[in-house]
Structures are given as structure tokens and as C-alpha cells.
Amino acid sequence: MKTTGAFCVLLFISSLVGVPNPLDDSTADQTKLIALENAWNQAQLHHDDRALDGLIPDTFVYTDYDGTVMNKAQFLADLKDPSYRATMIANQNVKVYPYQNVAIVVGNYHTKGTYKRKPFEHFGRFTDTWIYRDSKWQCVASHTNLIKKGAEF
């Protein structure tokens, strides 16, 4: 039984040898992913659902800080909501954790604006899961949560 298990592990590892890894040039890919995160922020600032449409697949899942879960269509519709007017969205302490054809991007965000004419200011953290397929990066899942003002940011 141990021999069969060891063989299966060896077979799996050897199957990965020929798989190209887009993160071989880690610095370039990390820079690209951070640029995509910044493009995402700009799309949100300008209610640009077309810009985000190419960054997220049809299977996209978003979990908002209040626990709301949205699919791609819901997320893009929410993005166009004219009652939400962000005046600033900034990421800080962004880190990219590369894996085979996948990268996890985490960081802090600070956003200001108005929602239904009431001012807001949020400090939070985000986790985005990106996959590399069809020669491009797409974010398949995103999660945000709020942190208290003054918490480690």
C-alpha cells in the first residue's frame, strides 16, 4: 500500500515537470498583478464595468465586508450603482504569493466617498485569488473585510 501511495505522489510530481509556470519571472508577474489590482481600483472609481469585465471570469465570486456574496453579474451591476461615489481607493502593503498558475494577492485598502449621499471612510483588508489561463490573469475570487481605524494598516 505504501508503494502505491509513493508511486501516486511521484506520478503527480512528475506530471508537473512539463507544465509551464507563468510565475517563473516572479518579479514581472508580481508587478503585473499589482498593476491589475490598481486598474481594478480605477475601474471602481469610474464605475467602469467594461474594464473589470475582462479581469474577472463568469465564475467570479465576491464576498463583501458585510458578508454579501455576489457573482460576476451582480458585482458588475453593483459597480455601476450611481449612489456609490468613491473619491479615493488606495491599496497598501500589497503582497503577491505565487503558486503554479495561481497567485494570491493580499493587502490593505483605504477608501473614501459617499454612499446614498452619506460620507464614508473604510479601512480594510482584501484577498484576491488570480489564475493564469488563456495567456492572461483573471481574478476568480475576491474577499474584503473592514478593520478598525488605527489597527495595523
Regions flagged by a language model, labelled:
Residues 6-7, 135:
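Residue-level marker of positions within ordered structural domains that often coincide
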Residues 21-153:
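A beta-strand edge to alpha-helix "cap/lid" segment located at domain peripheries
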